[in-house]
Amino acid sequence: MRNIFTLLLSIIFTSVVTSQDVNDNIRFIPQSQVPQHVLDRQETLFPTNFVSEWRVQEMDGMQDAPNLRYIAKFEDDGRPGFSASYLPSGVLIFNSEFMPSEIIPAEVRLKIDRDYKDYTIRHADFITFYNPKREIYMVKLLKDIGVQYVFYNTAGNEIPKDSLPLEIKI
């Protein structure tokens, strides 16, 4: 009986471990592997912020420089939840800020309440893109056990997923 229980437990554990969703295109890296252009730009744009981690993202699975993005996760005045994404040359692609549901602007919250009546707003990320300049709220919604992300501009208009910048789709 004990052997059967152990075997059953190991099968369950193995299936849980092997079924985890892993993004092989993003990995943690030490600051020493971040290009100096990226480090300098981060220091210039966010001089008082503490970078807690660096990640590198390989676009399309390619590891050559034009296909890499460097992502800094940092704190602003002790508040975590900020990130910035850079090209290897130091060009800022976008930065984002975590927002609890309570501080999402009223025009966005009201539209979500109207469009997604059965959902609860969990939080949002306020994302600023720089080429071309766009500001987007990526809002996480919950319904029972389901999760859905919706996207709104600063005027409170929903953005169709097919018109989002490529960087947000990856």
Indicate where each model-derived feature is located:
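Sec-dependent signal peptide cleavage junction
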Residues: 18-48, 160, 164-170
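Bacterial Sec-dependent N-terminal signal peptides
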Residues: 1-25
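A short, surface-exposed beta-strand/turn
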Residues: 80-94, 148-163
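Sec/Tat-exported extracytoplasmic proteins
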Residues: 45-50, 116-119
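Outer-membrane beta-barrel domain signature
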Residues: 28-29, 61, 99
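Long, charged/polar, surface-exposed segments that mediate recognition or autoinhibition
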Residues: 83-122
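Exposed beta-strand-loop-beta-strand "reactive/processing" segments of non-cytosolic proteins
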Residues: 50-84, 129-151
